[in-house]
């Protein structure tokens, strides 16, 4: 029996909303890391002001940076709880962002000049369908996926993860993230355990996007590593990349 994937995913993120920004690697609050992400947006987005749809916007990290750069941003997320946090941040900063509650596969009509996402594609039950829907609302635009290699069950990965967890416990580091998706949900997420960007690139191409380019985000990786005290930075570093394509 196939679970209610959207309902399960929505409930999971609603439950995580109040803790999300306190979890390691989620919020873009460090100035050096924010500068790296700002530079990435400048590289890959059309010149401002452009109409940008941020899919899976969460608590608004990327939406806020894009708005700061002068773009007209629409933030889409399945979780009302996550968007509530994003709205509060936007109000505090005076950022004019439109917020829409909904699934990635059913974006608002647009049209948009660019569709962006950060660490969201792995949560999609049908990535090709979602990417196709994004192309429909950005018929002359581009898509920018900011992703990473989060999967991996090899012995080295397990050892690193164990050491990181031990260091956090010893140091008493706060991380209220309430754990991984239920296994019954993960089994239905095609990109949940990818260890290379190839499956993301293949899904983008299968959705009809063209001129697909892949770029390693070494500046973002370095900034994220510097954010963490030694030795957590090197231990938690993962390859990150941008996948950019045209409609």
PLM regions with names:
Residues 105-115:
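A short acidic, Gly/Pro-enriched loop at the edge of an enzyme's catalytic core
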Residues 226-247:
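Core SAM-dependent methyltransferase catalytic element
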Residues 128-142:
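A short glycine-rich, Lys/Arg-flanked "PGG" loop and its adjoining helix->strand segment in the class I
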């Amino acid at each position: 029996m196939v679970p209610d994937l959207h309902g399960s995913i929505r409930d999971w993120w609603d439950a995580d909303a109040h803790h999300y920004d306190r979890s390691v690697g989620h919020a873009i609050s460090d100035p050096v890391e924010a500068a790296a992400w700002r530079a990435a947006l400048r590289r890959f987005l059309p010149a401002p002001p452009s109409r940008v749809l941020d899919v899976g916007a969460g608590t608004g990290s990327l939406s806020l940076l894009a708005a700061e750069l002068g773009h007209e941003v629409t933030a889409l997320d399945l979780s009302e709880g996550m968007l509530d946090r994003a709205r509060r941040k936007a109000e505090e900063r005076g950022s004019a962002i439109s917020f829409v509650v909904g699934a990635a596969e059913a974006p608002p009509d647009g049209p948009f000049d660019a569709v962006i996402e950060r660490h969201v594609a792995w949560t999609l039950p049908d990535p090709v369908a979602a990417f196709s829907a994004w192309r429909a609302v950005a018929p002359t635009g581009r898509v920018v996926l900011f992703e990473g290699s989060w999967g991996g069950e090899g012995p080295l990965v397990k050892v690193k993860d164990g050491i990181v967890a031990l260091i956090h416990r010893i140091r008493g580091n706060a991380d209220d993230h309430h754990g991984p998706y239920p296994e019954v949900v993960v089994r239905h997420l095609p990109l949940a355990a990818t260890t290379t960007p190839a499956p993301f690139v293949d899904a983008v191409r299968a959705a009809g996007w063209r001129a697909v380019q892949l770029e390693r985000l070494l500046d973002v990786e370095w900034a994220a590593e510097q954010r963490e005290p030694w030795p957590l930075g090197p231990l938690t570093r993962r390859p990150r990349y941008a996948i950019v394509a045209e409609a």
